[in-house]
């Protein structure tokens, strides 16, 4: 169960302001969880790659949070107050203005017998013997199911398939081991960055800009030097993007501002 939930924690971490694998005297590096071609390793790689690809969106949202008093992780009622079904929703949230995240919170693959052994050995200094935990027969290639709710007042796009669903309904969705349910609000503009090993490996010269039709939308791409506080003195740029849904046009305005090395 530890391996399974470690993957789920990593997938949840992708959609937190800071993604960090932290622990005391516990293995955290992905190469300690298998090798390429094995489900746990591959799922961790997928999560890390997704996080890096979302950096333009995440960094720009960080600017919205700090400069315009916005919020990163938003309870659904903050954006959909007119929908009473969101008022007490504790298993989903908005990540910025675009993403509805429904993390997998419980083990779906680990046999119940193994889960019981681990529960009985919880706590500091209490460790179940590996030989006591029957994980060898776990098939991570199987599909599972979970329920989620899409708030009323918007259409929603499945991030993985681009299938569109109307808001205001509960869905039973298929889950797989290497990803969690993830939806994008209609009208969103989401910039995706290059495939990198670390954030500053490549410049954002050729971003992929994804538009999700169904409503008007806007987004401001924010950039700065990335390694200092010069932005506090105006060393940053903004590129406004506007989606007109009726005309099906995306307008990318001129860059505003400047910083060293841009």
Regions found by a protein language model. Name each.
Residues 1-179, 183-185:
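Catalytic-domain carbohydrate-binding cleft regions of carbohydrate-active enzymes
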């Amino acid at each position: 169960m530890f391996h399974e939930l470690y993957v789920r924690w990593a997938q949840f971490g992708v959609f937190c302001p800071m993604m960090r694998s932290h622990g005391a005297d516990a293995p955290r590096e992905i190469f300690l969880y298998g090798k390429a071609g094995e489900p746990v390793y591959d799922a961790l790689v997928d999560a890390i790659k997704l996080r890096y690809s979302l950096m333009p969106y995440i960094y720009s949202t960080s600017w919205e949070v700090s400069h315009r008093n916005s919020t990163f992780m938003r309870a659904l009622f903050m954006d959909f107050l007119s929908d009473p079904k969101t008022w007490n929703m504790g298993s989903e949230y908005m990540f910025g203005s675009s993403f509805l995240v429904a993390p997998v919170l419980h083990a779906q693959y680990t046999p119940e017998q193994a889960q019981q052994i681990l529960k009985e050995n919880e706590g500091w200094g209490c460790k179940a013997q590996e030989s006591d935990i029957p994980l060898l027969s776990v098939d991570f290639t199987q599909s599972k199911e979970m329920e989620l709710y899409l708030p009323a007042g918007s259409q929603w796009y499945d991030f993985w398939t681009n299938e569109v669903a109307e808001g205001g309904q509960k869905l039973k969705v298929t889950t797989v081991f290497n990803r969690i349910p993830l939806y994008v609000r209609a009208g969103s503009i989401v910039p995706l960055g290059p495939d990198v090993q670390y954030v500053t490996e490549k410049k954002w010269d050729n971003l992929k800009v994804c538009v999700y039709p169904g409503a008007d939308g806007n987004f401001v791409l924010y950039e700065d030097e990335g390694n200092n506080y010069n932005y506090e003195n105006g060393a940053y740029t903004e590129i406004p993007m506007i989606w007109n849904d009726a005309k099906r046009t995306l307008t990318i305005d001129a860059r505003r501002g400047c910083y060293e090395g841009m």
